[in-house]
Amino acid sequence: MKYRLSVICISVLLPPISGEMKVIDLTWAHSKEMPQWPVEGIPKFKLNIVNRGFLAKLWFEINWFVTPEHGGTHFDSPAHFAKGKWRAHEIPPERLIGPAVVIDVTSQAERDHDYRVTKSDFDRYEREHGRIPHGAIVLINSGWGARFQDKKLVFNSEKIDDPSTYHFPGYHEDAISWLLTNRNVSMVGVDTPSLDYGQSTTFKVHVLCGQNGIIGLENVANIDQIPVFGATIFVGAMKVFDGSGGPARIIATFDPLVSHEYRTTWIVVIVTSVLFGIYGIYITCFRMRRVGARHTE
């Protein structure tokens, strides 16, 4: 009876198992509506439709487009801010895949739109979820993704062509310096337009990342839809010869059973199983003692 009870309790506590990996798109659609950093001489995105209709009785679509490298969801090559470092076509493919680490600073960013991620945020993550793994792709969830459809909200400014008016979160250079020195990461990313916070004029985070061969990811979408640990990130970085960056299709995959919301459940299951095991041993020993006592009588 005790074993049946144990099985029933564990079955109730176990999370549902679908047997399927979840796939989350971390990419905003590339379009003329996407935010891009205003740099003189850089055109805005344009899609020119050459044919969208029947051609010789066959439906046929073909277009050409012009795009900035650093607009919408995109990657920064190390060469973007560091002379002589990898350009887009030189990035090793193994650097485009890695375990995700999501640093949640939504509450901090809500209070301070110029919030910069600090080493204490990394410390807090490691206390709760363990050491940042080798080759990690570190992503910041500041809640800024909810603003993406409105450029004024993304840059947090009424003057979207004037970077001096921008206010949005990013990394602090001291935190990045510690991360690059003490943890062997592959990429760092944000759900905002820049790795540096909006009021930066020196772009020290970009410089540090470039000098250390770290790829940057900006305007990453749906970070709030992946677990803080346990996901794998795949970055489809456009391989433009001599490019300083470019559009990226970023995908996350993960097993729901290792995501944060399931971990507590599994801890409860393990503890419950141990307790039932101890209870079973206790009952068995108690019965053996009673049987032994009867034989003695």
Residue ranges: model-predicted function:
Residues 2-270, 275-297:
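Active-/binding-site microenvironments in catalytic and ligand-binding cores
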